[in-house]
Amino acid sequence: LQDLLGLLLLFLMAFYVFYPLLFKNKAIFLRDYHFITYPFRYFLSQAFHQGIIPYWTPHGFSGMPFMAAFHPGVFYPPSVVFFLPDTLLAINLFYFIHFLVLGSFLYLLGKLWGLSFVARLCSSVTGMLSGFIVAATLTSNFFLGAVWLPIVFWMYLKYRQEKRIGYFIGTVLAIATQTLAACPEISIMTLVLLYAHCLWFMSKEEGRAGYARMTASLGLAVVLALGISALQLWPTAALMEHSTRSGGMSYEIHTMWSLEPHTLATLVLTPVYIVEAGSGAYPGFFWGGFLHTLYMGILSLVFISTGFFFCRNKAIGFWLLVFLLGIWLALGRNNPLYEYVYHSIPLLELFRFPAKFFFVSSFAAVFLTGFVLDALLNHTEKRRLTIYPVVTVLILLLALVVWVGLNQPYLGMENSLIFLFIFGFAYILFYFGKIRKIVFTTLVLLLIIVDLNLKDFRLLPLIDRKFYEERPVLADALKDAYGKHRVYSGRIQQSSFSTLLPASNSLDGMLLLKQYLTPFTGMVYGIENASGKAGLGMGISKQVIWVAAMKQADADGRLRILKRSNVGYWIDPNGENPLDSNGDPVISPDRIRVFKDALPRAYLVPGVWLAKDSQWLNAYYAEAFDPLQHVLLSEPVEFAPSNHFEGKVEEVSYRPNHVTVKTSQEGTGFLVLVDSYFPGWTVTVDGKEEKILRANYFYRAVQLGPGEHTLEFDYFPEGFKEGLIVSAFFLLILIALPLCKPFKRVPLPRSVPFPPDPGESP
């Protein structure tokens, strides 16, 4: 009954937090959520409604892989909510479910570790409403991966404790789900942390055989989870072969978003404003960096600091080490020893942003909140702790809050000072027996809830859902462009090239990004953009090269690149932006520049030139080259040009993962389709399979003879068939596991020695 009450309280907490999203027509916006999360989930939802798997999207970089890119989470199990007809409601439910799952399994994990009822609730609330989780929500996949750590821990530790096959299967499924959440660095950190935790708490009685069994069982769970996930991982691995990341990233790129030392101030204080558009409280301020706040609660900081007096407790000592190690690694380039770490740890160069290491510190803070609270209560009641260490910690934290607040005026310190005084006064009363333990612990829980609700979750920016539902003016003006010409939004004339305008996280900035239909916001409105964000396509080489070509070219060169990329419409961001009656910026249709001489989506050419890789791109964008007369290929073909050539493209039509082109011509020539060339595309000409040639560096061509032709292009990702077979094989193994001989149950001691032994002292 107590556990049901605890889980009900966590449900009510999550319900309270998400009430505006579920019942008041609010939606999350800002940063990645605005121009990545919502457009990608919307596209996925529309594909599900059509009953197809979205292998490909035409809405960025002249078409790019969608499913294999990993980030969209096509096979991520919670994505089933996107079968709901209301995409915004589905997204809000999607996040509500994740918050609820996070809090529930933090509670269950606390129970497994022997924490008291209130300590479990304090840890769970800290995890659900922490600044890390709020900040990670705006980066989507980072948040989705983080949620699964307590589930992976709980499942595997329950298996270790009870040796029930059901918990082992649960471990496999939890690891697989976290893997499919598409943040591999989080998955790796979770497994490394779990393995380290098991080693730390391994009893001497288990000996070497116990180490071997633990290593083998966790290793087997990982192998089975990766096997089940192969339907996603195999095509993603095939896509990686075309990525600039396949050989690893340089130290400079890898450490681009390191945790800045000044950001550590948000461990103590965090901005106090409400980020809600239309509330009048939106200040236009955004904390820079990968995570805009690290705040875990002022009481969490109290417990972390007090934890050093209990470091002989095995659990507290472990999580203190993890907390410090996570911050040390998160500093990245600001850590003088990090470059040695970068060169020493295998595969680390494949990932970006050392700030992500704060993930382990955040969960360490969550667990320390519960462990230290119980240790403090235990030692206080048994008088194994004097009042002076706690008072000293509180005085030092009060001084730290004042110092940070005075030096960082945008970080409000008033509430933190009040909470510290209330906690200190209550602890003194509890220490001298003036209030009962239940009163003190209940007050601690309430302080944590109020503190995190005031300071952290209110930083999750909300806006009315009409922000996403109302079409930009330019989207209506471009409604006939789909399948014919692409759109480009960004500077051309300026020497400082930028595809995103304005480079701001303010409310006006977000509204302008939507009005300008910048990548990938136009995905929602059926806009096919010639550009995009190369990082979301896993740094596909051709995408990076296209962006680099635009950056390096002069104004005339950029115009030529756009026209030869089938860009018929350029949205010019320069000039003043008028405001509507609500004070929101509106971009009028006169901002659209029409390129009447842009290449059509598909056309026929009579001639062919061969180009070397080193000259291919320069030749295509050269002013002297006429793309309507010749196609540039890198491989020789048997081709006899006709004395007379005439032809036209009769029709170009698109369906998901499919393009149909109908042509008629006299003489031999080539169809050029200005859609991205990518392995996985196949074509039939009049029902007979033919070869797709890589044309003009980026696009596709098919050699055709005289007559009328129907070309059917289909996309099926490389490695998907093999991945399906592997996933099916490992899934059958998992299903068969319960039929195998039961595991011999060997009772193990509790994984965490809590409460502390009587002889233990701070």
For each of these PLM feature ranges, what is it?
Residues 414, 446, 450, 454-644, ...:
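Extracytoplasmic
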Residues 2-65, 237-246, 302, 467, ...:
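Hydrophobic alpha-helical membrane-insertion signals
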Residues 281-302, 408-414, 646, 652:
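Membrane-interface anchor segments at the N-terminal boundary of transmembrane helices
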Residues 302, 328, 556, 568, ...:
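Active-site-proximal, structured, solvent-exposed surfaces of multi-pass membrane proteins
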Residues 11-105, 125-147, 241-242, 247, ...:
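Membrane-interface coil-to-helix junctions
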Residues 10-13, 103-112, 117-203, 217-236, ...:
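Membrane-embedded helix bundles of polyisoprenyl
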